[in-house]
Regions:
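Conserved, mostly hydrophobic/aromatic
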Residues: 22, 36, 47, 95, ...
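N-terminal amphipathic alpha-helix/helix-capping segment at the start of soluble metabolic enzymes
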Residues: 1-23, 134-148
Length: 163
């Protein structure tokens, strides 16, 4: 399976100027990605922090984005456990993480989001994030690392002081 398309929608579009998108808090219809893409959105940011959206609904949304010219992203509620890896495994092109206050927390976030050598994300192949393909694992990890966007949210005085 060729992985050219897996280098990431956002990096390709950002190189041409700007990107636009929207937060998704409600209305998790599988038609939402197609509507947003036809309206010109480059990404959808699904919010797990402030909504009740779970992994099953997110899996449906990630699948609905597949094949469209739109990148699904997820704001996770925490880096605890394997939430970051799970949302990436189900097809998210990146994560936004709230309340990052220290350089150590930022490093941990990067470690969880990227495959070696950039990070230490656990491996899983032939699943949603690689379109259920059969490419060589090294190629899959490299493509995923190129595609993955990590956003650390600085929301506190402590976080700002540590920037």
């Amino acid at each position: 399976m060729a992985l050219e398309h897996k280098t990431g929608i956002l990096p390709q579009k950002a190189g041409k100027g700007y990107v636009s998108g929207m937060m998704v808090f409600e209305f998790f219809s599988t038609g939402m990605p197609a509507i947003a893409a036809s309206a010109g959105a480059d990404f959808l940011m699904y919010d797990m922090e402030h909504t009740g959206i779970g992994f099953e609904t997110l899996k449906d949304q990630m699948a609905a984005c597949r094949g469209l010219d739109i990148a699904p992203l997820v704001r996770v509620p925490t880096t605890e456990g394997n939430t970051v890896g799970q949302v990436l495994d189900i097809g998210s092109h990146g994560v936004m993480v709230p309340m990052v206050e220290t350089a150590e927390q930022a490093r941990d976030l990067v470690r969880r989001a990227y495959y070696p050598p950039e990070g230490a994300r656990g491996t899983a192949f032939g699943i949603a994030h690689d379109d259920y393909g059969t490419a060589h694992p090294i190629d899959i990890m490299q493509a995923a690392n190129q595609r993955t966007l990590v956003i650390a949210m600085i929301e506190t005085a402590r976080g700002l002081a540590n920037v």
